[in-house]
């Protein structure tokens, strides 16, 4: 199946941190990330967050941290590919989800390398393009293109949310729809 299913999804948020968003159009990427995280919380979709060297780059930005589900795991990392961190492959596998929805900073480095590794592990990987960013538009474009060429499905916030909902009869429809108005 090529559409997202809330029961089979895990959200992986990559490095949306205090010092990394400063060089970006942070209002857009943070607001989009908040929408996906809020929808995941409403739909009981598990969320894992990574932080690249938080001692130097700061923690996850507060507006995003404020909407994360209570059981969200925040994983410190130094590898660009999050799956290279000790126990990360096992942590993701422990959720038993086949679809990984990934987004964050920087598109062409950490998001790209992690998405490639997830594909190699056999996951269906969906990148939320409008919730990703790079300091440079060219690198952003190349990162998205490289992921797509590798087999990652490129999506956006609204597509993901409405695929998770499936229809207006979903009991969480109004709550999730309100996130994009």
Give names to the regions the model predicted:
Residues 19-22, 28-50, 54, 62-66:
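A positional/architectural concept
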Residues 1-10, 43, 55-181:
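Active-site-adjacent betaalpha module
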Residues 7-22:
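Generic N-terminal amphipathic, Lys/Arg-enriched alpha-helix
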Residues 16, 52, 130:
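Active-site loop/turn elements of alpha/beta-hydrolase fold enzymes
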